[in-house]
Amino acid sequence: MSVNRILVINPGSTSTKIGVFDNERPVLEETIRHDEEQIGKYKRIIDQYEFRKETILEVLHSHGINISKLNAVCGRGGLLRPIEGGTYTVNDAMLEDLKNGFSGHHASNLGGILAYEIASGLNIPAFIVDPVVVDEMEPIARISGIAGMERKSIFHALNQKAVARKVAEQLNHKYEDLNLLVTHMGGGITVGAHKKGRVIDVNNGLNGEGPFSPERAGTVPVGQLVEMCFSGEYYRDEMIKKLVGQGGLVSLIGTNDAIKVEQMVEKGDPEATLIYKAMAYQVAKEIGGASAVLHGKIDAIVLTGGLAYSKILVDEIKERVDWIADVIVHPGEDELQALAEGALRVLREEEAPKEYIVREKETVARG
């Protein structure tokens, strides 16, 4: 089998994770920590790309990586327009939306730009894979009870789809042939209904929908939320923080550290026990609802993300949902590996690269 060497780039707010893979095998994985004072010199996140590019190249050189031997560069997908899942070639339309922050400004927007900047000088392809804006929801799933307020698809697409593919392989099937319920449990929690390779419904794990999580509120009583918003006690930013960042376990028990909460549970703390069980209860309830989306025809339920390492949490969830389908646990997440595998599928011609096309007010993914 021929060897494809792939450079993978995953930018964060103060760090850049990079990996070099020979096919699926990691040759180098490193987290580059950026000096906050250095980063602070740039007015916009997007202005950091040249600095980060040079830093990446220096690190590769220091490890003896010859970039002329690369076959492709793959970056973390950023806040683009809604697109279907898959591996996309970085093109001018995508670069424009990433640079302009079409759907928001975030460090992940640098992923496609850095991939392109490095790849173009080597005359090799640049890709992104399954960004958080992946949207494969069916029309019926978008409807909410208020006109003009459509449900949105924002979830852990990269890890959900990567793990779903691994489970399909484990079951000796193609991802596109199975119905799976995939639950990513980390700082946020998302439950996706995967129907034959498409996530046709999923809770918005960012903006207050679904189970509460270590630091997100999830679905809350809307009437009480409206009263709180107009009580005059809180600014808009404070309310947003209550939903994202200071919600969930942070609000209920004062920490987003699930390990600490587990220790409290093991010591018999009744409040911690009730709250941790409530989080598992809400995850199980979301899985149960998602099973109806797939008419109860489920090949497997998959639990993944950092919280899937928690035996207490996993056992609580299993107890409530294992009657629906077998529960398969794939703890943790490996974004670098997932990005490399997405690029590899295209390089091996197992799937065609998709093209990011902007037509007036819509984005079209053309395979």
From Swiss-Prot:
Can you list the GO cellular component terms from the UniProt entry? cytoplasm
Report the EC code(s) recorded for this entry.
2.7.2.7
Q: Where found in the cell?
A: Cytoplasm
Example GO BP = acetate metabolic process
Question: Would the keyword ATP-binding turn up in this protein's UniProt record?
Answer: yes
User: What keyword terms does UniProt attach to this protein?
Assistant: ATP-binding, Cytoplasm, Kinase, Nucleotide-binding, Transferase
Report the coiled-coil segments. Answer: none
Q: What is its main location?
A: cytoplasm
Q: Which GO molecular function, any one, fits this protein according to its record?
A: ATP binding
What is the protein's given name? Probable butyrate kinase
